[in-house]
Every structure is written in C-alpha cells, then in structure tokens.
Amino acid sequence: HKAIRRQRQMCIRDRVNIGAFTGKTIIDPLRNVIGEQAYIYINYFSGAMTIIALLAVILLYKSTHTAGEGKSLREISRGFMKIITNWRLLILILIVTGFWMVQQQLYATMPKYVIRMAGETAKPGWIANVNPFVVVCFVSFITRLMAKRSAITSMNVGMFLIPFSALLMACGNLLGNDIISGMSNITLMMVAGIIVQALAECFISPRYLEYFSLQAPKGEEGMYLGFSHLHSFLSSIFGFGLAGILLTKYCPDPTLFETHAAWEAASVNAHYIWYYFAAIGLIAAIALLLFAKITESIDKKKEASR
C-alpha cells in the first residue's frame, strides 16, 4: 500500500538524518583541538561507527519477511541489468543525480568555502547540521502534505527549490555589511540556502524511493531500492570532482598566496561556484518536468489502446 510505503520511507529518512546530525557534531570540536588533521581522523571515527552498525545488524536484525532475500550474485546482476535497461528508472536516476550533486556540496564545497571566506572560526560542521535538522523536523509534514499528489509531482516541487538554494548560498559574497551582528553574511546565506535545500530533500527523497519500489517486481523491492541509490555514486564522483575544479578556480587555498590581498583578488568571484550548481539544479528540474510530461503521455496512450 502506498501509504505504508511512504511511512517506511519517512522512518528511513528520520534515522538517516538523526545519524547525519549526531555524526557532524564531532568534527568542529575535533578541529579545534587538532586543526586540519581532524579531517583525517574523522574518517577513522566514521569507519568505526560503520563497523559497529554492521555488526549490530548482523547480530540483532531478524526479518520476518524473507521474500527476495538470499539472492545469488547472478540474480543480483540480472536485477541490475533490468534496471539499467529500464529507460524510465535509468533516466530518473540520472535526473535525480543532478539534485544530489548540489546536495553533495555540503561536504565537497561548503567546508572549505566557508572557512576560506568567513574565516578559520567558522563552524562548517554545525552549518551542515542544518540540513538533517530541517529534514527530521519537516519530512513527515511535507510527505503528508503531498500525499494526494503523485511521486513525480512532489519531486518536481523539490527539484525547482534546488537552484534557488544555490543562489541563496551565492548571495553571501554579494551582500555588504553583516546583516546579523556576530555572524558573517557568508554563514548566514549558507544556512538559508541549506534550509531550502533540506526542504527540497523532504519533497524528493521519500517519494523517489516510493516511485522506485512501485516499479519493482514483487519480492525484489529491496534490490530495486538498493540500486536506486546509484545516484549517490554518480553524484559523489561528479559533484566532488567539479567542486575541486571550481574551488581551485574561484576560491583557492589562501596558503598558496604570498599576501592576503593577492588571495582576495583571486577569490573575488568565489560565489560563481554556486552559479554552476544553480544551473545544474535548474537543468535537472526542467529534465524531471519533461520526464513527467512524456511518461504521462505514454501511459495515457497505453491506457487508450487497451
């Protein structure tokens, strides 16, 4: 039942984002103690938590629903081929990759951008925590609000919020005097953009997983949902790669310059980075709108021919 599927996806998002929030509380205190080495040691912490979680699942989790479990590698390979030869699912994965490329900038661009532009006292860990906090607070409400709308419609709303979020992030470097005393405009507008980005995630993620699960043959829902996260693989590769190129071009490392004035001249257009991601988000949003129109037209023709 669709309502049950939505409830499951909301529960998944809540747990993922609670973990995302608590995990990020470590990085800023660690950075205050050991400096840049924190970005190395945080990976050890993440690895340890992952191993503990894996052992907990192996030892404690027992499913009462065994349909679709225990598949061989050959069956998994066949399932993968079914998905990549299903043009609807493949195109949807590629489109949603555009959203996640922008979302990945919480980790790829934002930390270095904020520290370089707002100063060493900036707290990128807490800034990034705005995302999971907003998702946990609003995902249930938004999913219920859009319950009578199709999954694609809900996703479209979120997709068109994404370019707006990137433009808000760019505004931090365009404003004059600080709007809020004690908080740089870079930080303020980054938080504003992340709030909008998190709301977009509330519209997109649960309904994306719902759409994927509805396309799966009975007993293969788990495998299809697993492959639905191919967007994470693609968005990480392309999102982090592009972030490195854009940071080098528009917001380079200050230690590479002899004077602060030379660095300021090199980073005067640092906000251009967010224009690129606004464009990616807008292209993805338009692509999803076209996808919805085309698939709806095809489905109507099939219904009429029956």
Report each predicted region and the residues it spans.
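Single conserved hydrophobic/aromatic residue that forms the stacking wall/gate
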Residues: 1-8, 12
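Extracytoplasmic gate region of multi-pass secondary transporters
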Residues: 23, 87-125
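Helix-to-loop junctions at the C-terminal end of transmembrane segments
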Residues: 31, 137-157
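Symmetry-related core transmembrane helices of the 12-TM Major Facilitator Superfamily/SLC fold
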Residues: 40-59, 267-290
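Loop-to-transmembrane helix entry
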Residues: 41, 115-134, 157, 188-191, ...
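Juxtamembrane intracellular "pre-TM" segments in multi-pass secondary transporters
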Residues: 65-92
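C-terminal ends and interior cores of transmembrane alpha-helices
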Residues: 160-182
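Hydrophobic core of transmembrane alpha-helices in multi-pass small-molecule transporters
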Residues: 180-204
